[in-house]
């Protein structure tokens, strides 16, 4: 005898779980939504994790069916945390790639002249380094796990600011005090959709990446 599965439970079981670097509002979430549409995933369920290593680890352990991670930025180059994760965990395959334009904002409850600390993901700090040198030369730069985490940490503080997207400013209810602040107007990041199932070769042109140690 088998217990019946109700319609709601069956629907949840059929959804494709997609891991990404959260929390909500990050560039990774935007990329995850776009890649899920390109891949034509049916009713994807997006699951945020606190670090890129954790995202790839959950995929490798088959806790989810897909993952979206940033792999390369046009200004800062390869995303080290992603590359290290792909080196650490075996049998991870790239299904699709997407280039997402990146436009950063300075977000704070204070004014620019009050800011003494700037928080963000290391990649975002690097992409705005020249702007920070020219406009906030004395501010201490503090790395966080994600741009969304940075905005949460500065909310309510007049001497702290975060670098993140304007969308996060609206989501978290914190003011945008400067935009755009990225050093390169054409700043963009390549995100990839990862799978723990081997991707069949359909005869189209592929891009191969090689990693080695000395």
Predicted features and spans:
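Domain-level signature for soluble enzymes in the chorismate/prephenate branch of the shikimate pathway
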Residues: 5, 11-214
């Amino acid at each position: 005898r088998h217990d019946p599965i109700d319609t709601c439970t069956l629907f949840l079981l059929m959804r494709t779980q997609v891991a990404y670097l959260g929390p909500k509002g990050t560039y990774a979430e935007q990329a995850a939504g776009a890649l899920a549409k390109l891949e034509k995933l049916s009713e994807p369920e997006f699951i945020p994790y606190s670090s890129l290593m954790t995202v790839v680890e959950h995929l490798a352990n088959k806790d989810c069916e897909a993952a979206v991670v940033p792999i390369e930025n046009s200004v800062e180059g390869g995303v080290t945390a992603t590359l290290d994760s792909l080196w650490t965990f075996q049998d991870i395959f790239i299904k699709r790639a997407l280039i997402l334009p990146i436009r950063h904002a300075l977000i704070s409850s204070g004014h620019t002249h009050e800011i003494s600390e700037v928080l963000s993901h290391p990649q975002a700090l690097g992409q705005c380094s020249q702007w920070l040198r020219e406009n906030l030369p004395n501010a201490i730069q503090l790395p966080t796990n994600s741009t969304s985490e940075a905005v949460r940490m500065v909310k309510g503080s007049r001497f702290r600011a975060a670098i993140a997207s304007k969308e996060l400013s609206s989501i978290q209810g914190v003011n945008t005090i400067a935009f755009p602040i990225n050093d390169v107007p054409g700043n963009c990041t390549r995100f990839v959709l990862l799978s723990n199932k081997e991707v069949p070769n359909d005869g189209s042109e592929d891009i191969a990446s090689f990693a080695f140690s000395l």
